[in-house]
Amino acid sequence: MTDTAEHFRIETDADNIAWLHFDKSDAGTNVLSQAVLEQLDLHLQQIAAQCPRGLVILSDKSNGFIAGADISSFTKLKTSAEVMGLLETGQTVFNRLEAMPFPTVAMIHGFCLGGGMELALACRYRVTRDDPGTRLGLPEVRLGIHPGWGGSARMVPLIGSIKAMDLILSGRSVDGRTGKRMGLVDRVVPERHLRSTARSMV
């Protein structure tokens, strides 16, 4: 069974696992805008109502998982209320994802940065492709901003304050194997095992 929408596609397989495919329309890279977040929230509510065995979030873009927030949309924010609205939307969506009553897995390849990393941290588990091109991090400081969707708060208890602050304050990214050693991700596997591993985690 499939359900298509502008940026997302839900696939529920024979084992009642929901696969949420992210493929931002008219874009070469997955980024998170206000509209994308609102659509994601609706899909999460729909999936929660279906009570699947688990949820796997993955990207249909060949170049990576999610690059982060849609930076181009920042210039359209004219008031502090609009800024707060974007922050609150992201926090609401990721809190909903974190509170899902079944296992959730971020299936990561390529870049998983900024808001993409924050989304992955809101999942119960994270599995990455074993590839030097896999990059995990919160580079917001390099833009003069701070992670605003709960990523820093979720990262600290996961990997400890020292390692988390190093990543957050430097803005540097790490590959999957380094992320596994730090405790940032749970599994690092070859591409051919990525989907089966994600399935096994739910």
How does the language model describe each region?
Residues 113-168, 182, 198:
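CoA-thioester-processing core
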Residues 1-23, 169-202:
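Amphipathic alpha-helical segments at domain termini/boundaries
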Residues 68, 84, 91, 114, ...:
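Glycine-rich phosphate-binding loop at the start of an alpha helix
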Residues 57, 70, 119-120, 179:
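Hydrophobic/aromatic residues within transmembrane alpha-helices
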Residues 15-23, 35-78, 92-109, 129-134:
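A structural preference for short, pocket-lining loop segments at secondary-structure junctions
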Residues 79, 160, 190-191:
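Helix-capping/helix-break motifs at membrane-protein junctions
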Residues 78-88:
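A short acidic, glycine-rich active-site loop
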